[in-house]
Amino acid sequence: MITYIIIFILLIIAEFVYFHIADKCNIIDKPNERSSHSTIVLRGGGIIFLIGVWVWGAFFGFHYPWFLAGLTLVAGVSFVDDIHSLPDSVRLVAQFTAAAMAFYQLGILHWSMWWIILLALIVYVGATNVINFMDGINGITAGYSLAVLIPLALVNINGAFIKQSLIISTILALLVFCIFNFRPRGKAKCFAGDVGSIGIAFIMLFLLGNVIIETGDITWLIFLLVYGVDGCLTIVHRIMLHEDLGEAHRKHAYQIMANELKIGHVKVASLYMVMQLLISLGFIYLCPNTVLAHWLYLATTLVVLSITYICLLYTSDAADDRI
């Protein structure tokens, strides 16, 4: 316990040091017509997630060196992109290379079925970017990530899948970030930036990857279902509208709630957090531990969330028509 208190204090100090550097170097996020915020805010505060894993390694040992190397690579490139925009090709090469490092750490690069590895790499990088796209309002990245990692810590209570200290240290980093970001619109001290959203996505996917490989059950991805439904259905919606997927937009469900329906950032972030917590805890404690039950639970929640998303779109369109 004392160790975790020390880690928490060190992370708070590290965040303040970063704020000083970001302020001096003018690492800021300026609002535009597609933003869900209206004030200039420090960018890149999510670097604390990378720092948190390094601090964890310093205290508990570097048990997953390839994972840490991959995280450092993808977060580092993302941080540079936060400061000076990089070509998509550079970011994708870094993301696929980092994902391959994580896969090497997971021990799956030697699998004979190369097409499964290739598909898994595409899913890993795709999911990383979907999580990144979901970082658009105060509190949503940290709050949702807590809703993923807390149930994961409960599943891993005896360290059955991965070092529990890594999960707890990451949770501490998220709590530190929440202090400065889980605030009403216009009140956040910092934003996560790509370094934060990409970094925490990489961490969560690696942790879930350990559980999936150990259990042989891919339905554990339900821990990311709320983000997955919003992110994927938004992409489908934009394709149907013939929009350029590379351009910024405000069509995610959370953006519709925050911008069109004028629901507060903290309320929307809390809603996403609570929904994912309820789904994950139900999966752990209410769903029978069988493959069939897991798939039925996943399918049911997927359908319910998809219908909810579609209804929200119609609600938003109706509101626009009234205006």
Regions found by a protein language model. Name each.
Residues K251, N259-S280, C287:
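Alpha-helical transmembrane segments of integral membrane proteins
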Residues V17-L42, I235-V266:
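Cytosolic, membrane-interface loops and tails of multi-pass inner-membrane proteins
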Residues H294-I307:
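Small-residue-rich transmembrane alpha-helices that serve as helix-helix interface/gating elements
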Residues Y314-I323:
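Single conserved hydrophobic/aromatic residue that forms the stacking wall/gate
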Residues M1-C232:
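"…together with the soluble PPM/PP2C metallo-phosphatase catalytic core" -> "…together
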Residues F283-Y297:
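Extracellular/periplasmic helix-loop-helix junctions in multi-pass membrane proteins
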